[in-house]
């Protein structure tokens, strides 16, 4: 019934049945308790013999010096442990700070399920909303943490989740309080298990002791609450599960309390996997309450690799599941496909490449083909990671998350690469190639664009090579950092997602990589774009080269993925929403039947390099790199059949692109600036002054003003009848809210949502603290690039 009991120290159990593997991540807003919860999971699973503490800087997953000194998660960490004896949980703890969004995006790419942690006092916060949207398609369970805090609101938070995320829920457990006779206050002591109809109370003096009480020991008020919750659970699940309806009417004789916990768990699992509902649990991880039921829920409700969504591929290849072998690409049980989602450099072990194996087995000593960059190498020393510690294994099987190490992988794999190997034969790539599967690629990770930059210069000319090597390591580990060079001044520019992001990069560059560099002041990453399509420019010579090039502006949402239609192929160029468009010719000898000496992929990659270098030269307003532009290569292009080098292609296309851009008048360019989504939480007595300051001094556009825990039934995701669904959902009374004096109108908080130029919001948190006596909070997320209006142009250019 319950997966927890006597805690025993356990090692890693290899080769677990696929159906008993859970690849999960923990996602939440910063300070919701992700790392604290992870530490308890490791302790109660027997993985560790002590509980680490964030404030003391001794947690397992936050092991970087910067993480321990700042008390925040900066990079995702992977660790494996067992639960319920035979289930293995591969857990990735992700950052909550907005500057490290890419770490979350990388992790979501390879996860099968998520645990969303909410702060019971703060409710559904900005970063939680963002990551919830990013994790669309991934089944989730929700854990409401910090139920011991004054002002915690379990039901308020559940209702907020339902409305903001347009999500149905079932209450798997609810908070259990007791009255403290000394203080006469309600104290959180455990949970009411709705599935098993039990009360679980944790001993405050012994972290390993849990008292489990049967239903006959409940007082009438608790029994009434639990009965209502059980009724609501059965009613909700019955909407999605006919088997439950049949069991309820026949076996349970229409009695909600007689419905079997086994049947309920099965029904919750089914509806969670289909994402019709999200199970809700609660606890206080810091007080060691509620973590074991959360682990039970991970095993009981979240998908195994056999039940997870299929990875998205670059081409139409059939994917299926075999109950014994796992995922099959093109019905080929011999092909092993893995995805590299993270690369880090360890000063002792060298380069570590984190991979998720989707099909087959990745074996030590086997040849591997990187279908993203065309490189081939042999696997040496695969390992399982336990935060910053490794465990050697001989292979990584389908569904597993592991790490490739050793000199054979160095420089051959980057984040987002697809790896292909033969599961049975060491050098079996030829047989995979014969079946046409060697070019299979899992769609890459979308890298968000940088919004801040700093100039980096070597302290002496002799330090330049060391600086470039250090920057290469930095960008390999974190592709959301971007290094570029000003062709006119030869200055090196490092760009990132935010002030903290670049501050951490600076620390690593100076302290970890020992780079002898000088670092300039923080600057905003402006871009330029063109407003009209250029005239075609043509090159043709007697040798056999012919290119017709046109450059056009792009409008609409930033997507940055390969697109292939019947008439043209689109290739993304870096992170600035630029594309290379190849028109498909009707002439034989091109495209799929290319028979030239120089490979077709080399031609494409060479022209991509031309585009990137040319766009980096910048526009005519401020010399900023180009954004949202497309280079179109007309379908009549020609390359000599006997050409073996790409140098001529590089020179020709680059000159054509530059010529095309130079032909445009300055008036055909526009300056782009980053716009931020801004969310400010402020006491309502300061609201007027804050709004006046935002609109008057920070060029903000106010989108909405809401109560902090207000419920907007009119959000774009809600359906017409969703208000009725939310209102009919049974939720227990929030008996602790009165302690927070939330009924005092003067203490109520408002949430101001706005859009504002990043330039106007730099260091705004200091201004907000001054306006609100230190009580205001601001959250910002990148919204997109927007053209600077003519009246603001001079102000922006002058800094």
From Swiss-Prot:
- Show the GO cellular component annotation of the record: mitochondrion
Keyword set includes GTP-binding: yes
User: Which positions in this protein are listed as binding GTP?
Assistant: 28-35, 93-97, 145-148
* Top-rank lineage group of the source organism: Eukaryota
Alphabetical keyword list:
GTP-binding, Mitochondrion, Nucleotide-binding, Protein biosynthesis
Residue span(s) of domain tr-type G: 19-306
Please give the InterPro entries that the UniProt record associates with this protein. EF-G-like_DII, EFG2, EFG_II, EFG_III, EFG_III/V, EFG_V, EFG_V-like, G_TR_CS
- GO biological process, any: ribosome disassembly
**A Pfam family for this UniProt protein?**
EF-G_D2
The places in or outside the cell where this protein is found are: Mitochondrion
Query: What's a single GO MF annotation on this record?
Result: GTPase activity
Other facts: This protein may be expected to contain an N-terminal transit peptide but none has been predicted.
Q: What does this protein do?
A: Mitochondrial GTPase that mediates the disassembly of ribosomes from messenger RNA at the termination of mitochondrial protein biosynthesis. Not involved in the GTP-dependent ribosomal translocation step during translation elongation.
The text of the family note is: Belongs to the TRAFAC class translation factor GTPase superfamily. Classic translation factor GTPase family. EF-G/EF-2 subfamily.
Q: What is this protein called?
A: Ribosome-releasing factor 2, mitochondrial
């Amino acid at each position: 019934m319950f997966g927890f009991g006597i805690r025993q120290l356990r090692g890693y159990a290899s080769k677990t049945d696929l159906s008993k593997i859970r690849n999960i991540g923990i996602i939440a807003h910063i300070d919701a308790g992700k790392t604290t919860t992870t530490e308890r999971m490791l302790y109660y699973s027997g993985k560790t013999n002590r509980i680490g503490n964030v404030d003391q800087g001794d947690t397992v997953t936050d092991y970087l010096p910067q993480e321990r000194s700042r008390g925040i998660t900066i990079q995702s960490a992977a660790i494996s442990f067992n639960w319920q004896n035979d289930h293995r949980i591969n857990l990735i703890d992700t950052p909550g700070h907005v500057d490290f969004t890419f770490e979350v995006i990388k992790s979501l790419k390879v996860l099968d399920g998520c645990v969303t942690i909410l702060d019971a006092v703060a409710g559904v916060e900005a970063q939680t909303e963002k990551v919830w949207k990013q994790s669309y398609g991934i089944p989730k369970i929700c854990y409401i943490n910090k139920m011991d805090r004054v002002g915690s609101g379990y039901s308020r938070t559940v209702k907020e989740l339902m409305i903001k995320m347009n999500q149905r829920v079932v209450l798997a457990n609810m908070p259990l309080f007791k009255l403290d006779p000394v203080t006469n206050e309600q104290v959180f002591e455990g949970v009411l298990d709705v599935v098993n109809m039990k009360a679980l109370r944790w001993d405050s003096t012994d972290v390993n002791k849990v008292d489990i009480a049967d239903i006959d020991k409940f007082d009438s008020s608790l029994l009434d609450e639990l009965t209502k919750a059980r009724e609501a659970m059965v009613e909700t699940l019955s909407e999605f599960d006919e088997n439950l309806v049949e069991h309820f009417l026949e076996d349970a004789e229409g009695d909600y309390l007689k419905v079997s916990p086994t049947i309920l768990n099965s029904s919750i699992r089914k509806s969670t996997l289909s994402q019709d509902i999200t199970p809700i649990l609660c606890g206080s991880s810091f007080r060691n309450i509620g973590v074991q039921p959360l682990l039970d829920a991970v095993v009981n409700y979240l998908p195994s690799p056999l039940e997870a969504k299929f990875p998205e591929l670059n081409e139409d290849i059939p994917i299926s599941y075999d109950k014994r072998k796992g995922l099959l690409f093109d019905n080929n049980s011999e092909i092993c496909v893995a995805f590299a989602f993270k690369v880090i450099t360890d000063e002792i072990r060298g380069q570590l490449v984190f991979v998720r194996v989707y099909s087959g087995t990745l074996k030590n000593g086997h040849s591997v083909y990187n279908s993203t960059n065309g490189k081939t190498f042999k696997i040496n020393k695969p390992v399982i990671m336990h935060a910053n510690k490794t465990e050697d294994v001989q292979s990584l099987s389908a569904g597993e998350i592991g790490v490739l190490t050793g000199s054979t992988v160095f420089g051959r794999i980057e984040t987002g690469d697809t790896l292909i190997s033969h599961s049975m034969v060491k050098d079996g790539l030829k047989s995979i190639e014969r079946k046409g599967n060697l070019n299979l690629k899992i769609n890459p990770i979308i890298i968000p664009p940088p919004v801040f930059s700093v100039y980096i210069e070597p302290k002496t000319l002799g330090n330049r090579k060391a600086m470039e090597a250090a920057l290469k390591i930095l960008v390999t580990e974190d592709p959301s950092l971007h290094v570029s060079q000003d062709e006119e001044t030869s200055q090196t520019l490092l760009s990132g997602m935010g002030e903290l992001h670049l501050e951490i990069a600076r620390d690593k560059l100076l302290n970890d990589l020992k780079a002898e560099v000088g670092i300039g002041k923080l600057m905003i990453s402006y871009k330029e774009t063109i407003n009209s399509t250029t005239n075609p420019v043509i090159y043709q010579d007697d040798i056999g080269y012919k290119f017709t090039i046109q450059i056009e502006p792009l409008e609409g949402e930033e997507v940055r993925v390969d697109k292939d239609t019947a008439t043209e192929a689109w290739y993304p160029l870096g992170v600035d929403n630029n594309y290379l468009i190849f028109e498909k010719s009707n002439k034989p000898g091109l495209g799929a039947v290319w028979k030239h000496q120089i490979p077709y992929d080399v031609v494409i990659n060479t022209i991509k390099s031309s585009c990137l270098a040319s766009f980096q030269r910048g526009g005519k307003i401020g010399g900023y790199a180009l954004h949202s532009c497309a280079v179109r290569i007309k379908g009549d292009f020609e390359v000599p059949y006997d050409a073996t080098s790409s140098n001529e292609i590089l020179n020709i296309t680059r000159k054509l692109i530059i010529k095309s851009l130079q032909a445009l008048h300055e008036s055909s360019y526009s300056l782009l600036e980053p716009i931020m989504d801004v969310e400010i939480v402020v006491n309502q007595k300061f609201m007027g002054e804050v709004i006046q300051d935002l609109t008057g001094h920070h060029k903000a556009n106010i989108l909405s003003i809401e109560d902090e825990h207000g419920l907007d039934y009119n959000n774009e995701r809600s359906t017409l009848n969703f208000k009725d669904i939310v209102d009919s959902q049974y939720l227990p009374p929030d008996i602790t809210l009165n302690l927070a004096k939330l009924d005092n109108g003067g203490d109520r908080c408002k949430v101001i949502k706005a859009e504002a130029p990043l330039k106007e919001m730099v260091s705004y948190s200091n201004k907000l603290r001054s306006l609100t006596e230190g009580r205001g909070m601001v959250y910002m997320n990148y919204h997109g690039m927007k053209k600077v209006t003519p009246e603001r142009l001079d102000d922006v250019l002058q800094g």
